[in-house]
């Protein structure tokens, strides 16, 4: 939160602050988005205001860190169950990813889904491969022009049957209820990230499938 924003807020009567994706305060506040650290000033500027943080992925340590960084030590914590019984989880050792992803996508030609990749180049390569197989795949990564990312995101949100092939740059704030599958072509950065990313599937309560491909490292 910038000084300009804080100055503007200081002249406004505010009863409540709602912070979505609150885990970012802990995950990104130190290096990637230092502005998150500034959120601690809210409780000092508005000591009587309610500060509410919402996240789908915060373990006990993360929750405590969020409270600490918000300087909100008298907080009440509400935790809902993490079980998503409508999600089917599959984990496979990566062998031939092209063959494995095509098997996973069988009978999903008109369904919306997300495939997560580690690199920007991989999103382009996987999209090109799937388009040649008659799927409607579009890439999404931070290296694209903002207008391209916006256009691709709007296509995904407004049309059915689109496969978004993306880095983790895609997903924050995305709420499309009928995503039927999420695949990872590599291991996510953490269990929390994995849970959040597959959690974008099946939000309508109907069955959805996930696939995680991993490489086995042999140490000699």
Map each language-model feature to its residues.
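Helicase motor core with emphasis on the C-terminal RecA-like subdomain
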Residues: 1-218
């Amino acid at each position: 939160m910038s000084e300009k924003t804080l100055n503007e807020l200081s002249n406004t009567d505010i009863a409540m602050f709602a912070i979505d994706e609150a885990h970012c305060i802990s995950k990104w506040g130190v290096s990637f988005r230092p502005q998150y650290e500034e959120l601690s000033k809210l409780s000092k500027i508005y000591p009587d205001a309610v500060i509410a943080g919402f996240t789908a992925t915060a373990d006990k340590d993360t929750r405590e860190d969020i409270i600490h960084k918000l300087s909100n030590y008298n907080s009440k914590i509400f935790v809902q169950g993490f079980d998503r019984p409508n999600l089917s989880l599959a984990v496979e050792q990566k062998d031939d990813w092209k063959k494995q992803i095509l098997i996973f996508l069988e009978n999903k030609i008109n369904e919306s889904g997300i495939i997560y990749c580690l690199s920007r180049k991989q999103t382009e390569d996987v999209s090109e491969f799937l388009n040649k197989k008659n799927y409607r795949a579009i890439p999404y990564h931070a290296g694209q022009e903002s207008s391209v990312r916006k256009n691709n995101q709007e296509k995904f949100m407004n049309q059915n049957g689109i496969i978004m092939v993306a880095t983790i740059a895609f997903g924050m704030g995305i709420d499309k209820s009928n995503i039927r599958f999420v695949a990872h072509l590599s291991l996510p950065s953490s269990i929390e990230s994995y849970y959040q990313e597959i959690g974008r599937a099946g939000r309508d309560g109907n069955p959805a499938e996930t696939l995680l491909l991993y490489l086995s490292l042999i140490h000699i």
